[in-house]
Amino acid sequence: MNILAVDTAGKTAGVALLQDDRLLYEVYLDGGMTHSETLMPMIDTCLKLCGLTCADIDLYAVNAGPGSFTGLRIGLAAVKGLAFPRETLCAPVSTLEALAAAHTGEGTVLCALDARRAQVYSAAFDLATHTRLLDDDARAVTDLADFVEKCKKPLFFVGDGAGLCYNKYSLSLIHISEPTRQAEIS
């Protein structure tokens, strides 16, 4: 199965191509241009370098938020435009769930994206069981205090809002985590 994944939720645009469980291509671009200028050339380059066309894609995975409203619209519209002519399946992917899926081990991962004005889009997951502990939501950084303090397992903050959270809470409770590469889309 060929899966083309698109991420336009933040200021960095990303495109990846998976063939079954194997990553064939991955690129992220934060070049100062808008996603409307960069996304389609990124997809075109991806397909050409992998020797594929849109007809070879079995599934499009697209970031469905939370994130930049305009960025999400660009990604969703692009994927809809590519998928529609061949009625190719599309799978919406939570930004925060995708961040969590890149991490493995024991403990809790709290995904945080900067939503500005001292807020983060956040969700939390148990790493061992992949159970969701907090739903996707925009929260004031201070509103996460109860969750952080009650967390009994090692707590890992990930995402571009991790620093905002890290600076608010006891350093003994928190770890910053780097992603583990894996390909799992359900």
Regions found by a protein language model. Give the residues of each.
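N-terminal beta-alpha supersecondary unit
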Residues: 1-64
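Surface "functional belts" at beta-alpha junctions
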Residues: 22, 89-173, 177
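Residues at secondary-structure transition points
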Residues: 30-38, 69-73, 77, 94
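Phosphate-handling active-site elements
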Residues: 48-55, 84-93
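DPxDG-like acidic metal-binding loop motif
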Residues: 61-89
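Single conserved hydrophobic/aromatic residue that forms the stacking wall/gate
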Residues: 174-186
